[in-house]
Design a protein with these regions (language model features):
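Phosphate-coordination/substrate-recognition cap region in phosphate-metabolizing enzymes
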Residues: 3-4, 45-121
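Acidic, low-complexity terminal tails and accessory targeting/binding regions
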Residues: 1-7, 91-103, 164-172, 184-235
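Short glycine/proline- and acidic residue-enriched helix-loop micro-motifs
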Residues: 111-150
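Beta-strand elements within well-structured catalytic alpha/beta cores of enzymes
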Residues: 8-12, 57, 83, 169-178
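A mid-sequence, solvent-exposed acidic-amphipathic segment
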Residues: 138-169
Length: 235
């Protein structure tokens, strides 16, 4: 990577956790990686061998930290210090933490007059995390949730920190392990046309900063996981 200040963020979702497996809401709440979740993080790390990261970041949730450490080790970037950023922590679901995902999504859909979140998306052509964020914020009376503006401001601050730190190093490639809603919202902030319905565990979305602007490449890409499996003799 030339020292032009170009920054390539490998924005990665953490490996599958216990709460993911149970299909329960996991925002600020946390649970450890499952065996499958750790394995996919190992695969990702092997797939990223040869990528010389100049820095590594994770949210301050254990699942992101655990994933990042596995990826750093397997990709031979374990010499880096892992920086923890609360700014890229997942959206907090307040009283809905630990609830079944489908229960919450159905409540969100009904708040907008639809029977399911799928029918809401299909009939409105919406694919925007703000729908869920702002509806959950309104339904949660505990005051523990954020609205979309506050959530976006927090994420922007995290991106700014990563960008400034990396440019101070002359630019380069950076590993960032975060969460599903975080990745959705960052994509929407930069290029909504690149957003996906689902961000898979251990997928990589490239966030590039060059010539004064951000762009999104390869959203939700599982290429590195698949490459890592093949490198280890897997299918």
């Amino acid at each position: 990577m030339e020292s032009s200040g170009r920054v390539v963020i490998y924005l990665t979702r953490h490996g599958k956790t216990i709460l993911n497996t149970l299909d329960r809401v996991q925002g600020w709440a946390d649970s450890p990686l499952t065996e499958e979740g750790a394995l996919v993080a190992h695969d990702l790390g092997h797939g990223l061998k040869g990528t010389n990261f100049v820095a590594a970041y994770a949210s301050d949730r254990g699942r992101a930290i655990e994933t990042a450490r596995i990826v750093m080790k397997e990709s031979e970037n374990h010499h880096l210090k892992l920086e923890q950023l609360p700014e890229i922590r997942e959206f907090g679901f307040g009283k809905f933490e630990g609830e079944y995902n489908q229960t919450v999504l159905k409540m969100v859909a009904k708040a907008h007059g639809f029977e399911s979140i799928e029918s809401y998306y299909d009939k409105t052509a919406a694919n925007n995390s703000n729908i869920v964020i702002d509806t959950v914020h309104k339904m949660d009376e505990t005051g523990m949730t954020e609205n979309s503006a506050i959530f976006e401001k927090r994420l922007a601050a995290g991106l700014d920190t990563i960008l400034q730190d990396t440019q101070n190093r002359g630019g380069g490639e950076v590993l960032v392990v975060a969460h599903g809603m975080v990745i959705h919202r960052i994509i929407e902030m930069i290029d909504p046309s690149k957003n996906l319905r689902i961000i898979e565990n251990a997928s990589v979305t490239k966030v590039i900063f060059e010539n004064g602007a951000y762009s999104i490449e390869e959203p939700g890409n599982m290429f590195y996981v698949e490459a890592g499996k093949k490198a280890q003799g897997g299918v």
